């Protein structure tokens, strides 16, 4: 494929998401540009606890919720991405190429925050680049936090994601719903419950990582996992102006080590929070935060 256009470098992120999709998800993408597909899901006034489907070239997308908020003032839902065969979408940090899913809820009523969570990704090399994500339909859990838990809420979300085959289509659409309008929908609740069950568990001593001494340009971690070490993979999300290359695995003295090039980093190392990682194996997956290198 010729490198005619670099659509991802020219796409505008959702408002408030500029940091989230800085260079880590916009590099090296060889695609034929169809342009961003922008629109509203058909027939989707905020009258249902789930939105209508929005149809695109490579699949369709909708928001589904389990209805009313829980005691903590949170509404649980999923960004439901139904991919056509041969199409793919991306993890929170796609790798060499791609656009991660994003959601902007600034137009919503009584919604303070929306947090996307990600099932364990797979690593792929399709001949155009190495990427982390999903090559089959996937439901990404979303947790909506209410500003005032005792007040009604409506969700009016701008969703932005990449759906790719041999071409990449940036999809941006508005999905609206009223979580309280159908709070006892068993089908929606089951979909949300199933999606939550796919998430990685918390890292633990026998299934997780230990950060080893590295340098300004290299992150090194030792991975611990039950079962076959050959199946283990390590994914790290470049955020806060960090950008990482593909991890290189090595085994020595019975220890599994991943060495990750740091391609870009902030001028000052952040002191709050950390970087998301996921460790996968044939036995399952765990995730956590590691200190900023």
Language-model regions, residue ranges each:
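Short, linear, compositionally biased motifs with a strong N-terminal bias
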Residues: 18-20, 38
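Extracellular/lumen-exposed scaffold segments
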Residues: 47-293
């Amino acid at each position: 494929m010729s490198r005619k256009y670099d659509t991802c470098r020219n796409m505008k992120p959702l408002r408030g998401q500029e940091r989230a999709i800085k260079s880590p998800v916009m590099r090296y993408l060889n695609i034929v540009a169809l342009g961003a597909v922008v629109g509203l899901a058909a027939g989707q006034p905020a009258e249902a606890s789930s939105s209508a489907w929005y149809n695109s070239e490579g699949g369709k997308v909708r928001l589904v919720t389990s209805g009313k908020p829980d005691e903590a003032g949170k509404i649980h839902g999923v960004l439901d991405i139904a991919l056509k065969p041969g199409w793919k979408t991306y993890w929170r940090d796609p790798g060499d190429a791609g656009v991660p899913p994003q959601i902007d809820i600034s137009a919503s009523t009584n919604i303070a925050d929306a947090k996307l969570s990600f099932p364990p990704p797979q690593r792929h090399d399709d001949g155009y680049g190495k990427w982390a994500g999903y090559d089959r339909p996937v439901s990404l859990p979303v947790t909506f936090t209410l500003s005032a838990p005792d007040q009604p809420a409506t969700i009016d979300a701008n969703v932005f994601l990449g759906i790719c085959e041999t071409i990449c289509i940036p999809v941006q659409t508005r999905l609206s719903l009223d979580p309280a309008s159908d709070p006892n929908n068993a089908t929606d609740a089951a979909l949300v419950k199933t999606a939550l069950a796919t998430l990685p568990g918390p890292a633990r001593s026998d299934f997780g990582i230990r950060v080893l001494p590295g340098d300004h340009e290299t992150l090194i971690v030792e991975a611990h996992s039950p079962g076959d070490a050959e199946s283990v993979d390590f994914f790290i999300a470049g955020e806060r102006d960090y950008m990482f290359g593909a991890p290189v695995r090595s085994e020595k003295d019975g220890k599994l080590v991943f060495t990750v090039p740091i391609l870009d980093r902030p001028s000052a190392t952040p002191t709050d929070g950390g970087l998301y990682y996921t460790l996968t194996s044939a036995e399952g997956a765990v995730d956590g935060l590691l200190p900023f290198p």
